[in-house]
Amino acid sequence: MIIWISSYPKSGNTWVRSFLSAYYYSKDGNFNFELLSNIKQFPSKDFSRRKVLSVDDASKNWLVAQKEIVSKKKIFFLKTHNIYGAYKGNKFTTPEFSIGQIYIVRDPRNVISSLMNHYSIGEKEALDMICSPYRNLKDKNDVEDYSSYSFISSWANNYKSWKNSDIKNKLLVKYEDLETDTEQSFIKIIKFTNNLINNSSDVDKNKIKKSIENTNFETLKKKEKIEGFAEAILDEQGNKKTFFNLGKNNNYKKLLNISTTNKLEKIFNKEMKELNYI
């Protein structure tokens, strides 16, 4: 069965994956980027036996690939930015394959500045991206292969789709809580996942502290600078963009035009109020 680590892009998914990798896949809470291979991105080439030639083809492969995953009779963590929904009648996932989900949500005003750096786009284009109900993602390096195709829709649609999913076990995590109450937030995540994987052992608070220490933003940023980061995307010149970029310095009040924040607060008013962002 699958436990989804889901989010709109640049909302803290990699942080949560890194922490879970350090906690569950190391002996002492130490972390290296190779551990992330234990929590793969879905969809991706890792789950396709052949070249996927179109969006339609990609969507038809979603459940086929997941059926093969769950046939292994193990529980897998998978990362995704896809919405919980369907494309032309092809469902992304179902409760049949999904034992639980952790959805990470982040204030869209701070998501925008991260999108700008990550995708080398301007403020207007980032605003258009986060508001578009038709937005999708595909690995730039795979020009003719749609294995990695993800339909992410808008920030609000992405959030609502997972919030309202019919997966039985759900946990909503706010990025802001990860920043301000890190230890308690990750303890909550571990208690949730331990229950799903039938791990009856007590939460190892020492290992949690070590995992947090080894996956905090500054540590990951230093590791990326020294070692590089395989998941960083390429800019137009073919150079890898810095993945761990701003961290706590990502403050929309200092980085965005007031007109952009006003538009976001108007377009996403209902969801932002629901999440106490406004």
At which residue positions do the language-model features occur?
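PAPS-dependent sulfotransferase catalytic domain
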Residues: 1-173, 238, 242-278
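PAPS/PAP-binding and catalytic site of the sulfotransferase fold
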Residues: 12-26, 172-199, 211, 219-222
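Acidic/polar loop patches that form or flank catalytic/metal-binding clefts of enzymes
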Residues: 31, 198-206
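Short, compositionally biased low-complexity segments
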Residues: 183-187, 232-245
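Composition- and surface-driven signal marking solvent-exposed, interaction-prone regions
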Residues: 185-186, 203-204, 278
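Acidic/histidine-enriched alpha-helical segments
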Residues: 204-214
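Short acidic/His-enriched helical or mixed secondary-structure segments at domain edges of catalytic enzymes
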Residues: 212-239
